[in-house]
A protein has these predicted regions:
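A hydrophobic, small-residue-rich beta->alpha segment in the mid-to-C-terminal subdomain
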Residues: 135, 141-150
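N-terminal strand-loop-strand beta-hairpin
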Residues: 1-116, 148-194
Length: 194
């Protein structure tokens, strides 16, 4: 497994971020696409998933989040596969319990070796993830984009829901079987804190 060196910046304006990305010389490598995923329970602070990233790319991932306060707090391993349904069946066959079926929209940009993703999830404002080969690369890119290090968040999207709604991550992870755009939000997602 390797460290996922990534920082999130919440509540962004897509048009302003796209403009800033163009200004610094980043290029859009994948237009906004609907992604769908099944997430599986693998124990405390970790999960596995099968994600259809659009354009025929299917990825199975295992993540362990040991520290949601650190840019180096997440380790992951990814395997590209050729069939979404078979990936889900594989996880089930290994005895993993499904946590949730989820969807989001993602647009991907590159700035050198740094990947910038504009992510939109149900019931929360759009945010970006900046992922790079080193902490320095992530922070340099954020600075060029006018983003402040002290505003960065870390961890998985469940911690983003926790930030906006004050709900325990286990409620998002273990007790919300679907997070989809075409559904009414669950009770916990009806009153935002931020």
């Amino acid at each position: 497994m390797h460290n996922e060196i990534e920082a999130q910046f919440l509540d962004i304006n897509k048009d302003e971020i796209r403009k800033k990305l163009k200004e610094i010389g980043a290029g859009c490598v994948k237009s906004e696409v609907l992604m769908r995923r099944f997430v599986f329970d693998t124990g405390p602070h970790s999960f596995a998933r099968v994600r259809d990233e659009g354009g025929g790319k299917i990825v199975m991932t295992y993540k362990n989040v040991s520290d949601e306060e650190s840019i180096l707090g997440t380790k992951e391993v990814n395997v590209v596969i050729d069939n979404y349904e078979n990936g889900v069946l594989f996880m089930r066959g290994c005895g993993l319990e499904e946590k949730a079926e989820q969807e989001s929209y993602r647009e991907t940009w590159m700035f050198g070796e740094v990947e910038i993703c504009i992510d939109t999830w149900p019931w929360i404002p759009t945010f970006i993830e900046i992922e790079g080969p080193s902490e320095e690369a992530v922070w340099d890119t954020a600075e060029k984009m006018g983003l402040k290090r002290e505003k960065a968040k870390f961890g998985s999207v469940d911690s983003t829901y926790q930030y906006y709604y004050g709900v325990d991550e286990d409620i998002v992870n273990l007790h919300t079987p679907k997070i989809m755009f075409d559904m009414e939000p669950p009770e916990w997602a009806r009153k935002r804190l931020h």
